[in-house]
C-alpha cells in the first residue's frame, strides 16, 4: 500500500514528505525533484515570493546512490527564508519580551474570507490565525510535488507512461478545446508563461491576468492532467473506495483552492443524451478501438486503456490585494482582511501539483495490481498481465477494416 504524509509550515525550517510502500530499484535523484519543484514555481501572475523562493532538496532516507531501497522515502524541502522567521516560528519556547518587538509576530486576528483562518481559529482554539495559515498554506504542496516526483519516476520506469498537465482556462478566458497533448508536448507547455497548449488560449489567459492585476484582484482557472498508455484494469468496480475515479477526486480535492474535479468530459457529458455520451467500441487489428474518450479513460472505476483525463477547477486566490470585509476576532468589530504576500494567479502551478497527486494515486493503484518488492519484479508482473490481457482481447479477423477506420477518423 503506497502511503504519503507531509509535515511542516509555510515559514518553518522545512517541509518534509514521507512516501511509504515504494518498491526498490526506482531511479531518483535530488535533481529530479528539484526540476519538478522548479516547474511548480512557473506561471504568469505569480507573486514576489517566487522570485527568491528556492527549494533546497535533501533526501533524508530511503534512497542510496540514486536508487530507492524499498523502505520509506523521506524528502526535505528547505525554506531559504528561515533565518527571517526563526524566532517567530521557533518550535521551542521564546521569551515573550523578545517576540513583542518583532513585526512578523503581530497577532493576525482578521481572518481572510476563503481561507482556513476563521474555522481553524475556532476549531483549534487559536486567538491568532498564524498557526492556521502556516499549515494551510499552499506552500505545503511543494512536499507533495517532491514525493509525486518519485511516483512519476515509478510509473515511467515500470509502465512506460508519463503524467503531464496543461491549463484549460484562467478566469473568463476562452477555454482550450483542441487536441489532448501528450508527453512530447510537455516542453512546449512548460515554455508557455501560463502553461497553455495553444497560442490563442495563452493570449486570452494573459489578458485575463493583466486585467485582474490592474484591478487588484485574483483569478482561478481549470487545469487538465493527462496520463496516456495506462493498461486496462487499474482500480476496481467492487466497492466505492476501490474505484480509481473516487480516489483521484479525493486526491485532487485535497489540493489547496481546488473546488471541483471532473473525469473526462464530466459536467459536459451530464448535459448530453446517453446516445451521445459514451465511447463506442470498435474491433481493430490490435484490439478494440474507441471513437471518442468522453469517459476520460475510466469506466466503472477502472482504467479502460484510453488516456486518463482529470480536470481540476481552482478558485481565485483568497488573499486579495483589494482586501475583503471581515471581523476582527479580538474585538468583534468590522474590519478588512489581513493581506499576506500572494499571487494574482497560481493556476499554472496547480497543474504541476495535480500531476503529483494523480501520479501518486495511479502509482498506488499500479502497485496494488502488480505488486513486487523491486522494480524488476513489478515489471515482470506487468509484462505477464499485459500478455494475458492481449490474449483475451478480441481482434478484427476479417479483411473489413471499415470499423477500425471509422474509429480512427472520429477519435476525440
From Swiss-Prot:
An annotated GO cellular component: cytosol
Cofactor info, note text: Reduced FMN (FMNH(2)).
Enzyme class at the top of the EC tree: lyase
An example Gene Ontology biological process: chorismate biosynthetic process
Residue ranges, annotated region (Disordered): 391-412
UniProt-annotated binding residues for FMN: 135-137, 256-257, 300, 315-319, 341
InterPro entries attached to this UniProt entry: Chorismate_synth, Chorismate_synth_AroC_sf, Chorismate_synthase_CS
Enzyme Commission number: 4.2.3.5
Residue numbers binding NADP(+): 40, 46
Pathway annotation: Metabolic intermediate biosynthesis; chorismate biosynthesis; chorismate from D-erythrose 4-phosphate and phosphoenolpyruvate: step 7/7
Keywords noted in UniProt: Amino-acid biosynthesis, Aromatic amino acid biosynthesis, FAD, Flavoprotein, FMN, Lyase, NADP
GO function term, MF aspect, one: FMN binding
Compositionally biased spans, kind Basic and acidic residues: 391-404
UniProt KW Flavoprotein keyword: yes
Reaction it catalyzes: 5-O-(1-carboxyvinyl)-3-phosphoshikimate = chorismate + phosphate
Cofactor(s) demanded: FMNH2
Entry-linked Pfam families: Chorismate_synt (PF01264)
Subunit structure: Homotetramer.
Family designation: Belongs to the chorismate synthase family.
Cited function: This reaction introduces a second double bond into the aromatic ring system.
Name the record gives this protein: Chorismate synthase
Species per Swiss-Prot/TrEMBL record: Mycobacteroides abscessus (strain ATCC 19977 / DSM 44196 / CCUG 20993 / CIP 104536 / JCM 13569 / NCTC 13031 / TMC 1543 / L948)
This protein's encoding gene: aroC
Amino acid at each position: 500500500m503506497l502511503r504519503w504524509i507531509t509535515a511542516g509550515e509555510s515559514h518553518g525550517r522545512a517541509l518534509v514528505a514521507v512516501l511509504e510502500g515504494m518498491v526498490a530499484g526506482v531511479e531518483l535523484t535530488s535533481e529530479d525533484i528539484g526540476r519538478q519543484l522548479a516547474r511548480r514555481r512557473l506561471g504568469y501572475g505569480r507573486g514576489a515570493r517566487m522570485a527568491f523562493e528556492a527549494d533546497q532538496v535533501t533526501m533524508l532516507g530511503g534512497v542510496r546512490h540514486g536508487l530507492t531501497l524499498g523502505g520509506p522515502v523521506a524528502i526535505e524541502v528547505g525554506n531559504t527564508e528561515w533565518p527571517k522567521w526563526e524566532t517567530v516560528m521557533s518550535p521551542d519556547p521564546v521569551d515573550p519580551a523578545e517576540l513583542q518587538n518583532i513585526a512578523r509576530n503581530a497577532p493576525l486576528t482578521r481572518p481572510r474570507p476563503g481561507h482556513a483562518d476563521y474555522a481553524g481559529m475556532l476549531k483549534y482554539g487559536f486567538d491568532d490565525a498564524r498557526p492556521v495559515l502556516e499549515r494551510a498554506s499552499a506552500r505545503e504542496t511543494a512536499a507533495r510535488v517532491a514525493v509525486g516526483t518519485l511516483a512519476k519516476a515509478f510509473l515511467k520506469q515500470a509502465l512506460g507512461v508519463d503524467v503531464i498537465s496543461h491549463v484549460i482556462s484562467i478566469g473568463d478566458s476562452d477555454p482550450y478545446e483542441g487536441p489532448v497533448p501528450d508527453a512530447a508536448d510537455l516542453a512546449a507547455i512548460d515554455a508557455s508563461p501560463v502553461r497553455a497548449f495553444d497560442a490563442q488560449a495563452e493570449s486570452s489567459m494573459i489578458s485575463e491576468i493583466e486585467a485582474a492585476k490592474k484591478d487588484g484582484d485574483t483569478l482561478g482557472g481549470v487545469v487538465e492532467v493527462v496520463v496516456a498508455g495506462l493498461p486496462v484494469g487499474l482500480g476496481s468496480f467492487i466497492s466505492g473506495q476501490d474505484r480509481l475515479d473516487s480516489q483521484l477526486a479525493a486526491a485532487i480535492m485535497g489540493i489547496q483552492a481546488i473546488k471541483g474535479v471532473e473525469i473526462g468530459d464530466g459536467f459536459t457529458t451530464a448535459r448530453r443524451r446517453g446516445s451521445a455520451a459514451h465511447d463506442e467500441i470498435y474491433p481493430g487489428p490490435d484490439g478494440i478501438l474507441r471513437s471518442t474518450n468522453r469517459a476520460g479513460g475510466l469506466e466503472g472505476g477502472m482504467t479502460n486503456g484510453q488516456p486518463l483525463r482529470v480536470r481540476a477547477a481552482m478558485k481565485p486566490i483568497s488573499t486579495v490585494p483589494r482586501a475583503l470585509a471581515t471581523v476582527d476576532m479580538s474585538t468583534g468589530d468590522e474590519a478588512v482582511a489581513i493581506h499576506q504576500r500572494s499571487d494574482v494567479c497560481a493556476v499554472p502551478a496547480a497543474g504541476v501539483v495535480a500531476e503529483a497527486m494523480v501520479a501518486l494515486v495511479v502509482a498506488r493503484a499500479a502497485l496494488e495490481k502488480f505488486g513486487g518488492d523491486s522494480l524488476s519484479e513489478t515489471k515482470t508482473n506487468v509484462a505477464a498481465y499485459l500478455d494475458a490481457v492481449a490474449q483475451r482481447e478480441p481482434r478484427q479477423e476479417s479483411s473489413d477494416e471499415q470499423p477500425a477506420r471509422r474509429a480512427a477518423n472520429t477519435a476525440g
